[in-house]
Amino acid sequence: MANTLFDRTIAFAGICQAASLVQKMAKDGHCDQAAFDTAIQSILETNPNNTVGVYGKEANLRVGLECLVRDFDNTPTGSELTRYLISLMALERKLAGHRDGMSKLGERISTIERQLDHFDIHNEQMLSNIASIYLDVISPMGPRIQVTGTPSILQQSMTQHKVRALLLSGIRSAVLWRQVGGKRRHLIFGRKKMVEQAKIILARI
């Protein structure tokens, strides 16, 4: 895959979309269904033709692109999003240095793909199985991501499954970010360029 500003922006928007949906799910118990489906499907796209192929098409990243452009501010919501983003990228770096972890992740995703021959991806058991990949493979690498939201909503098992599945999708996008050459310096010095690129993409979708 190409290491261009466009590719980095797409991958970063994928991480932003996961973080934004986690925040919405934890607070409200629901989120944009199409964006959620894109996030979950991205976990299973392990051999895409290009960067956009992970998400199907540019328009499927509207939530993430809009988040990238406008949501990272100094408000409590913006600070929380930033915390999720940094935590996801830190966990991905730990995963990248853990060969066994990458191998286990691949095996578990292959199992999910086989199960999809028999179950719908929205089935609670399927979402539970995807969530368990995050719990079993990613979470032990630490540090744990503290998700904040409405306590009564966060106590619901379906919400927990969806939040963990979304966190796994964030890890998937963080892996993509690294694969297309994303580095910390791009976040520090190249953020403005990514915002401009995101605006260009949003204008055409």
UniProtKB/Swiss-Prot annotation:
Regarding the membrane, this protein is recorded as: Peripheral membrane protein
Statement: the UniProt record of this protein carries the keyword Secreted: no
Localized where?
Cytoplasm; Cell inner membrane
The record ties this protein, via InterPro entries, to: HflD, HflD-like_sf
A GO-annotated cellular component: cytoplasm
Pfam families linked to this entry: DUF489
- Gene3D superfamilies listed in its UniProt record: HflD-like (1.10.3890.10)
Question: Which keywords describe this protein according to UniProt?
Answer: Cell inner membrane, Cell membrane, Cytoplasm, Membrane
The keyword Ribonucleoprotein belongs to this UniProt entry's keyword annotation: no
Q: Which SUPFAM superfamilies match?
A: YcfC-like (SSF101322)
Q: Which family does it belong to?
A: Belongs to the HflD family.
Protein name per its UniProtKB record: High frequency lysogenization protein HflD homolog
Which organism does this sequence originate in?
A: Aliivibrio salmonicida (strain LFI1238) (Vibrio salmonicida (strain LFI1238))
Gene name per UniProt: hflD
